[in-house]
Curated annotation (Swiss-Prot):
This is N-acetyl-D-glucosamine kinase. GO terms for biological process: N-acetylglucosamine metabolic process; peptidoglycan turnover. Its EC number is 2.7.1.59. It comes from Histophilus somni (strain 129Pt). SUPFAM superfamilies: Actin-like ATPase domain (SSF53067). Belongs to the ROK (NagC/XylR) family. NagK subfamily. GO terms for molecular function: ATP binding; N-acetylglucosamine kinase activity; zinc ion binding. Keywords: ATP-binding, Carbohydrate metabolism, Kinase, Metal-binding, Nucleotide-binding, Transferase, Zinc. CDD domains: ASKHA_NBD_ROK_NAGK.
């Protein structure tokens, strides 16, 4: 059996999958906040409980909201302070008596979608999350590509280019500071939060993403104008990503992925921002929703070989 963990700041979820990645069991508990040892104990207990339930020693994959150095096993997960800068791979492997693998949660999202039966034919799968933040994960032939320092796929920290700034109006363009310390990162524009901030700063009034989208479908002139600008901003930025990575398929997740107009408008807007010989990848909505994190974590042990 394959065990997948989605570890967040408030909840830890374990899900158990068979070799076809069909879920057989899941459990959620609160994330310990008092000590690293307590955090390790909770994960250990969940694994032992699953081992007993299924009478086996399952593989353990973990998705975290941060980075894990694959050489040292040390995690950088600042919103889970008890486990931040700790050697989680070494410590969990010793406690559980087996190899433990861990990846950024966006990579797990992408991996889950790459292992869907409808996507397994594609050698290069790019997952993009347009949620609270904007980020992604890159999968080559069923395996996460995270790079030498675990930063591959951190597309939210690419910055607006010439064409994006021109679209937003040069000296009128709102320049947002990112939590990473830089300015004009895609995370602050293409996320749900960025969608709302841009509308506020360009249209002069504050609305939620849901309200903006409702106004768009009601054919409100300012909302229609803004959405078309946002689609163009996405096309410019995602076009750059396609030029660099040339994926066969892009899977969208996060709150804005529920905006159906994206799937109609974005493929039409992309070609003018690509090389003439480039193919526009298939753009699809994520299938597994909230289960994608645990499913992708479990898939860290799968191989197409």
């Amino acid at each position: 059996m394959y065990y997948g963990f989605d570890i967040g700041g408030t909840k830890i979820e374990l899900a158990v999958f068979n070799e076809k990645l069909e879920k057989r069991y899941s459990e959620r508990v609160d994330t310990p906040k008092h000590s690293y040892d307590e955090w390790l104990n909770v994960i250990t207990h969940l694994v032992q409980k699953a081992d007993e339930k299924f009478a086996c020693k399952g593989t353990v994959g973990i998705g975290v909201p941060g980075f894990v150095n694959q050489e040292t096993g040390i995690a950088e997960i600042t919103n889970i302070r008890v486990a931040d800068n700790k050697p989680i791979l070494k410590d969990l492997s010793e406690r559980l008596g087996r190899e433990v693998r861990a990846e950024n949660d966006a990579n797990c999202f992408a991996l889950s979608e790459a292992w869907d039966k409808d996507n397994q034919q594609y050698p290069v799968v790019l997952g993009l999350i347009l949620g609270t933040g904007f980020g992604g994960g890159l999968v080559f032939n069923g395996k996460v590509h995270s790079g030498q320092s675990g930063m591959a796929g951190e597309l939210g920290h690419l910055q607006l280019n010439y064409h994006a700034l021109k679209l937003l109006g040069w000296d009128k363009a709102p320049i947002y500071e990112c939590g990473c310390g830089n300015k004009a990162c895609l995370d602050t524009y293409l996320s749900g939060r960025g969608f709302e901030m841009l509308y506020r700063d360009l249209q002069g009034k504050a609305l939620s993403a849901k309200e903006i989208i409702r106004c768009f479908y009601d054919k409100d002139e300012s909302a229609v104008k803004f959405v078309e600008l946002f689609i163009e901003l996405c096309a410019i930025s995602i076009g750059n990503i396609i030029t660099a990575l040339d994926p066969h398929v892009i899977i969208l997740g996060g709150g804005l992925s529920n905006f159906d107009y994206l799937y109609e408008a974005l493929p039409k807007a992309l070609p003018q921002h690509l090389m003439r010989t480039a193919k526009v990848p298939l753009i699809k909505k994520a299938k597994f929703g909230d289960s994608g994190g645990v499913r992708g974590a479990a898939a860290l042990f799968l191989s197409r070989d």
